[in-house]
Amino acid sequence: MYKKITLNDKEVEQAINNELKRQQEHVELIASENFVSEDTLKAVGSILTNKYGEGYPSKRYYGGCENVDVVENLAIERAKKLFNVKYVNVQPYSGSVANASAIASLANNGDTILGLSLKSGGHLTHGYKISFSGFFYNSHTYEVDENGFLNYDDILKIAKEVKPKVIICGYSAYPRIVDFKKFREIADEVGAYLLADISHIAGLIVTNNHPSPSEYADVIMTTTHKTMRSARGAIIMTNNEELAKKIDRWVFPGYQGGPLFHAIAGKATGFYEALQPSFKTYQDQVVKNAKVFADEFIKLGAKVISGGTDNHLLIVNVFDSYGITGKKAENILGKINITVNKNTIPFDTNSPMVTSGIRLGTPAMTTRGFKENEFILIARIMVKALKNPDDLSLHQELKNEVLEITKKFSLPW
């Protein structure tokens, strides 16, 4: 069991220990979050944070890098094996920096890029106007259809019209299988590069719970802390040697300076764990749990975007289902110790800070041992709360139920 920490800085100590209590007592349903292993916590909190070393293994601008070179090479080789790729850069601090580096390796400022819109489940870095991707590039978007699915014929039509240099596939709130082969065909037809952002589904991909883009994408990017259950950060991959050189240059010195070796160590330990048979068992359960979770909401009368899920997440339209916004739903559920995030839905009429939906994910609580029955129970608790948004007495009863559940499923340390 992870113990409370003691620091001379009592204000930070209290905040960390309060967060420990929150993580233990709340049902964590944010799809982009997970609970790392004790080994990964140790690696990230190690003395590697003291070491600086711009450059790449055996090509550093600083001395004393022989040990961090070992760590970085381990992370690289393990990622190659997991994703079946030839080249990997494990240095990106975050998914946003990784996407910036990946796009820059494929396009020049002012070139056209094409990605899924934010409301349809895309990410800020896929061309949203307030992001670098919408500021430095001529960004265009495609949408899901009225049923919440990608329509590849429509995507091809848009691609022919806007003639993108880069097409981005892979999303932050899309609950269905992505057909990377079809995206490759679209990219080839319009002469575009294909960038696959698999940040949400990477863990599913390496365990054969989702098709891999390694055969089709020119460049692949993933964060390492979602379904991969590794340290926070990102990696960029390719099978093209020339693109690999460009990627390396854009990561360093393009967008970053010295690597975070403690974070790279955490990535390496997470990749080691992902290579074990138990990780396959875990990801299988993540998908089973998500399917049952979605089905239970539908049985209880909720409107689930696309009618279900094929992966680790689902989107519930709370505006049409319960007459409340995603923001209010997030607040209600937070008060009964269920943590979710408000999320836009396709064709949303509410703003991104209000939204009509909530996004739910199963990876974190599956790590804590939840199986199908627990997710069915949590769905029922959530629906009771959302149907009665102002019944504070009921909310207290439901919170007590949640606390009894979380007591049985401790954090993984």
Curated annotation (Swiss-Prot):
Keywords: Amino-acid biosynthesis, Cytoplasm, One-carbon metabolism, Pyridoxal phosphate, Transferase
Cofactors named for this entry: pyridoxal 5'-phosphate
Cellular compartment(s): Cytoplasm
Entry GO terms, CC: cytosol
Pfam families linked to this entry: SHMT
Gene Ontology BP annotations: glycine biosynthetic process from serine; tetrahydrofolate interconversion
Matches recorded under InterPro entries: PyrdxlP-dep_Trfase, PyrdxlP-dep_Trfase_major, PyrdxlP-dep_Trfase_small, Ser_HO-MeTrfase, Ser_HO-MeTrfase-like, Ser_HO-MeTrfase_PLP_BS, SHMT-like_dom
Domain of life assignment: Bacteria
GO molecular function (one): pyridoxal phosphate binding
Cross-referenced CDD domains: SHMT (cd00378)
Site (Plays an important role in substrate specificity): H225
Catalytic function, reaction form: (6R)-5,10-methylene-5,6,7,8-tetrahydrofolate + glycine + H2O = (6S)-5,6,7,8-tetrahydrofolate + L-serine
Pathway: One-carbon metabolism; tetrahydrofolate interconversion; Amino-acid biosynthesis; glycine biosynthesis; glycine from L-serine: step 1/1
List of residues binding (6S)-5,6,7,8-tetrahydrofolate: L118, G122, H123, L124, E242
Name of the top EC class for this enzyme: transferase
Protein EC: 2.1.2.1
Protein family membership: Belongs to the SHMT family.
HAMAP family listed in its UniProt record: SHMT (MF_00051)
Protein name: Serine hydroxymethyltransferase
Organism for this UniProt entry: Mycoplasmopsis pulmonis (strain UAB CTIP)
